[in-house]
């Protein structure tokens, strides 16, 4: 039987893994088996938190819009504001509205007064 030389393929795979896990602490950056486990865990966390980041930012935008609207008047709520926006067919998403609320409140006041009518 001929001798099988399998030199660099496994080494190349482990080197890639080592580069990925080089910033991990302790054995998680030294031992191959724990490196693979931590790599899977890191990728799972990254995938989960990409979705969570979208939810968190949407919640932040809604909170900012709601805070500025409540300063304007007590009887006007966030959901009425969004409902009136859709009724008037204004294409402003929550991210843009939050930026307007943060940087230019008078502009948001005029928008809300226009859609109230």
Swiss-Prot record:
GO MF assignments: mRNA binding; rRNA binding; structural constituent of ribosome
Q: Which InterPro entries does the record associate with it? A: Ribosomal_bL20 (IPR005813), RIBOSOMAL_L20_CS (IPR049946), Ribosomal_protein_bL20_C (IPR035566)
Statement: the UniProt record of this protein carries the keyword Lyase:
no
**Subcellular localization, as worded in the UniProt entry:** Plastid, Chloroplast
This protein's superkingdom?
Eukaryota
An example of a Gene Ontology cellular component annotation for this protein is:
chloroplast envelope
Q: Which residues form the signal peptide?
A: none
Keywords for the protein's UniProt record, in alphabetical order: Chloroplast, Plastid, Ribonucleoprotein, Ribosomal protein, RNA-binding, rRNA-binding
The entry sums up its family as follows: Belongs to the bacterial ribosomal protein bL20 family.
Q: Its function?
A: Binds directly to 23S ribosomal RNA and is necessary for the in vitro assembly process of the 50S ribosomal subunit. It is not involved in the protein synthesizing functions of that subunit.
Q: What is this protein called?
A: Large ribosomal subunit protein bL20c
Q: List the top taxonomic levels of the source.
A: Eukaryota, Viridiplantae, Streptophyta, Embryophyta, Tracheophyta
